[in-house]
Design a protein with these regions (language model features):
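Walker B catalytic acidic pair
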Residues: 42, 105-106, 117
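The conserved Walker
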Residues: 17, 44, 107
Length: 223
């Protein structure tokens, strides 16, 4: 019962920043609890980044973000080795993906080589630079956004990368009532500042372990 109440409390906090879109928020939280990654396909400006930030605050997750463009390099994601003159050694400089919740914004604007830099982290929970593998912090969640197919400057994500995402969601345009509420919140100072922490990283891991213990019958598994 405790885990269920914590999940409801997390959603309550995220709703302070995101107006409406309850079904999307519930599914996104389910994906996080199921140790999955999320792909958001939508037009710009509908609240995808706000949602990711709100979840990171409510779950007390270290947040990282990269705005993907054609000139973003794989090393920007995974990190790189830099020569230190004072020690005479190569030292690892962590990339943006070394965090708990990584927002890959407009992922399909990046080159295929840069897109693939996320694959190892998403599938194996580690990055490899210069032959040395380093684990990403746990828990680890990727929320990637992509513009709709055919949008200017985009390219299709490969199937190998799409397979790393548990859910593919779309927020869509806000309704007139939701737009009015957004204006009210902006006028009176609501939004991200009102989001409070519900659990820490250890608490999230306990929630995930509770999900792992849920019994699934053979009939459901073979569906």
């Amino acid at each position: 019962m405790e885990g269920k109440q914590l999940a409801l409390d997390v959603l309550e906090q995220v709703r302070r920043a995101v107006v409406g879109k309850d079904e999307v928020l519930v599914k996104a939280l389910l994906a996080i609890l199921a140790r999955g990654h999320i792909l958001m396909e939508d037009i710009p400006g509908v609240g995808k980044t706000t949602m990711a930030l709100a979840f990171s605050k409510a779950l007390h997750l270290q947040y990282g973000r990269v705005q993907f463009t054609p000139d973003v390099m794989p090393s920007d994601i995974t990190g790189f080795s830099l020569y230190n003159k004072s020690t005479g050694q190569m030292e690892y400089q962590p990339g943006a993906v070394l965090c708990n919740l990584f927002l890959a914004d407009e992922l399909n604007r990046a080159t295929s080589r840069t897109q693939s830099a996320l694959l190892e982290a998403m599938e194996e929970g580690q990055v490899t630079v210069d032959g040395v593998s380093r684990p990403v912090p746990q828990p680890f969640v990727v929320i990637a956004t992509q513009n709709p197919a055919g949008a200017s400057g985009t390219q299709r994500l490969p199937d190998s990368q799409l397979d790393r995402f548990l859910l593919r969601l779309s927020m869509g345009y806000p309704s007139p009532a939701e737009e009015l509420e957004l204006l009210r919140r902006k006028q009176y100072g609501g939004g991200m500042g009102g989001v409070e922490r519900v659990v820490d990283r250890a608490g999230l891991e306990r929630m995930r372990q509770a999900v792992d213990r849920v019994h699934i019958s053979d009939e459901v598994l073979s569906y």
